Amino acid sequence: MNMIKIEPYIPTDISIEEISTNRIRISAYPFESGYAITLAHPIRRLLLSSSVGYAPTALRIQGVTHEFDSIRGIVEDVSHFITNLKNIRFLIKDTESDNVQLHYEFKGPMVLSANELVNDMVGIVNPEAYLATINENASLSFSLIVQKGIGYVPSESIRGKISEDYIPLDAYFTPVKKAVYEIENVLVEDNPNYEKIVFDIETDGQIEPITAFKEAIAIMHKQMSIFGVDLSTASSGTRNISEDSGELKTLMIKIDTLNLSARCFNCLDRSGLKYVGELVIMSENELKNIKNMGKKSYDEIADKLEELGYPVGGEIADDILPLLNRKLAKLKSN
């Protein structure tokens, strides 16, 4: 006969294992049945969407007027230069600063890599990353704005906040490359129905994975603190979601701005899929069953959605989903 409980079991064991540089495994147990998934899923979402990182947000290149231009004496055109630049992971050295403006000048011939961008204001966590090749008798002069932020911000949202001579960049701030979890059963006092959460977390080096995990827990605690008020005096109003909300803006990002491979983009485009929100509301099987969707294309889409804070199979808030569906239906009817 099972003993009657008057409160849920409190987990007592936690372990942290360093798998490799910038990757850890965290195990915690035992949880009551159902508690593990309840806690693990929002923590994973917070890790992917709310961890603070750094990214270039605007670029100005001497002699260049737009992002589809070429750069005299440089092997890469502007669009390829921007793609390479976005792969470089910066660190602002002054922890009190939210943004820095940088200026660089280089003369060829040389192969320009990320380590050449290190100075008194910024560091680079992947110094071996390739940026450009400068030909003999050529030079490259450019200015760059690097900012601190969370999640993903499309270039359209940045355009109106910078001077007209700068090119706005899609900003991928999140430093968390991977955040997955598994739920395992564990035995407690002859009861096999207790659960263990095992997190696998990897970052790009801008932040240590254990720090990202602690910050996600802190964010969750702050968000939950609203329920610590006296509920008898709390307002009964529901959340008012506007069309300008950050969450909705992310879901309405156009797929053609995500820098997907040509094969992957064409697969989605031929299926009439234009917006991130259309992918987010699809199940894993629905995504995989898109015509001509191969494994590489699926993995590329899954990684991109995870960067945006919407892993495949995840959930959209109940108050966001109707507004998203209305906007998509309106756009499709035009």
Curated annotation (Swiss-Prot):
Top-level taxonomic group: Bacteria
Top EC class, one word: transferase
Pfam families per UniProt: RNA_pol_A_bac, RNA_pol_A_CTD, RNA_pol_L
Presence of keyword Hydrolase: no
GO molecular function: DNA binding; DNA-directed RNA polymerase activity; protein dimerization activity
Location of region: Alpha N-terminal domain (alpha-NTD): 1-231
Region of interest (Alpha C-terminal domain (alpha-CTD)), ranges: 247-334
Glycosyltransferase found in the keyword field: no
Signal sequence bounds: none
InterPro entries: DNA-dir_RNA_pol_insert (IPR011262), DNA-dir_RNA_pol_RpoA/D/Rpb3 (IPR011263), DNA-dir_RpoA (IPR011773), RBP11-like (IPR036603), RNAP_asu_C (IPR011260), RNApol_insert_sf (IPR036643)
Disulphide-bonded residues: none
Enzyme nomenclature, EC number: 2.7.7.6
Gene Ontology process terms (BP): DNA-templated transcription
Gene Ontology cellular-component annotations: cytoplasm; DNA-directed RNA polymerase complex
Reactions accelerated catalytically: RNA(n) + a ribonucleoside 5'-triphosphate = RNA(n+1) + diphosphate
Record keywords, A-Z: DNA-directed RNA polymerase, Nucleotidyltransferase, Transcription, Transferase
TM annotation in the entry: none
Protein family per UniProt: Belongs to the RNA polymerase alpha chain family.
Domain notes: The N-terminal domain is essential for RNAP assembly and basal transcription, whereas the C-terminal domain is involved in interaction with transcriptional regulators and with upstream promoter elements.
Subunit structure comment from the entry: Homodimer. The RNAP catalytic core consists of 2 alpha, 1 beta/beta' and 1 omega subunit. When a sigma factor is associated with the core the holoenzyme is formed, which can initiate transcription.
Function of the molecule: DNA-dependent RNA polymerase catalyzes the transcription of DNA into RNA using the four ribonucleoside triphosphates as substrates.
Protein name according to UniProt: DNA-directed RNA polymerase subunit alpha
